[in-house]
Structures are given as structure tokens and as C-alpha cells.
């Protein structure tokens, strides 16, 4: 039979975000009904990853391609998911596991970012982009490589779309944080600031970005502060996931480890090189969902190869 595909999501206390992730999984099931397609979450939702693996095995899979449903490679993709794969290999020694790569700055992702920004501009009315500033907001991580990718995306969109200025900030963990970035943007004097949340799906953090942007705009009526939509379910996103799934199924993800803090001595992160690969989400696996704040765990994680095709993500 075809190799099974196991989509791994972060999980959220916000049921809307979980539902959007599950929608993508259902689209893949409908697209390829002859393939076993399951999912698992790192935290705050069920099924957890181990349960998703078990479902694949129960349905007859002898090869499982594990696909991280994430934009950037930080602690979750580099440690937590490979740690789960280690456990799955121990539990199912006769099953082969492949590990795919995160979406990263796939051309479809960049194009979808552009479309979401343009949708917001059209809704707000015409304005010269030379008089506008683009602010890309990432999740924020203790991994500088992931944070740098957000800054790279901001530059690509800034130059490619012709904004007067562009910048990157984050909603947590690292700096600059969104409130500080909004203040800086305001001081620069641009007539319009377009805030783009670089998130796959909605959730506590995406809604926080929107709320903070709207509140800042109300306090500063002299400038226009717009919050664009996040990526969300879209044919471009589906096709990007499909490409990553094919790579994973064939055990041939093309990974770039040149700036991974677990392999290379980066300034300020020297102690991370060669740390053991250990998951950090055991205490929040599948604990349920509510509308409260999302207690996110983004510690410094160790990283070694998971072995075989499920190695460094």
C-alpha cells in the first residue's frame, strides 16, 4: 500500500485554529482517498502524535511519512517532532518512518503572503505603496535561524511589492515585539502601515496581533494601520503541503542546515551545538482547548539527527 502521511500540527487552545488545520488534512484525504492520511498535535489538541501514528499502523501502513505542518524550523520541527519519531520507531520497529520538511519560504507561501496583503489593501482603498510600510509579524523563537527567515520574508515582500519601507517583528519570545515595532513604524511617519501576521492558521497569537494593531490604530488616528489576513486554507497552501508530502513519502526532503544553531556555532548560541534531542511537550499533550491565553513553550532545544530520513528538519 502507499506510504501513510501523518500531518503534525502545533495545536491550539483556540478551536478555530485547530479546525483550520484539520480542514487541510481532510482536503488531503479527499484528494488521495487511496492513501492513509492522519494527523497528530504537539499540544493542546487531540489526537496527539503517538495516537496519529497508531491510527496509521492500525490502518495497515508499513511506511509513515511525518510532515510538520509548520512554517519555520525551530524547536518543534528540530526536536519535539523528531523525538516523537524516535519513540514511534522504538514502539514499531518493523515500520519505516520518513520525516519531511517544514513549509519554509516556499514560492507558494510567498505568493499567498502577497495575495493576503493585496486583499487588505483593496478593502482599505487605494494608496501609493511608496507611502506605506509593511510590517511582517512572526511567532518568534529562541532559534535565530527561524527568526531570520521572518526577516528575510519581510525583505522579499518589501522589495517585491514596492513598499516604501519594510520591517519584521514578533509576537513573543524575541525582539522587537509588535507593540515596540508599531511605535517605531508610527515615528517613521508613513501614511499607511500594513501589518501582516505570518501564521498558517488563526489562534490566540494571530488574534492578539489583530487586536494590538487595531488598538494602536485607534490611539493614532493620524495614520492608517491595517492588519492583513493570515495564510489560512488556500489552493496555494494545499499545493505547497502536497509538494512537501511527496518529498517526505519518497524520503528525500532537501534540508538546509547551514545556520542551524544545533549544528553550527552561532554567536550567543554556542552552548546549543550537539545538545541531545529531547521533546518538551509531554506535559501539555492533548490537554484540551479553551478560549484562554495560549501558554506557549518555546525553550532552547537540543538537536541531533533523528536518523535516516527522519533526521534534521
Residues covered by each model-derived region:
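Active-site-proximal alpha-helix that buttresses catalytic centers in soluble enzyme cores
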Residues: 1-313
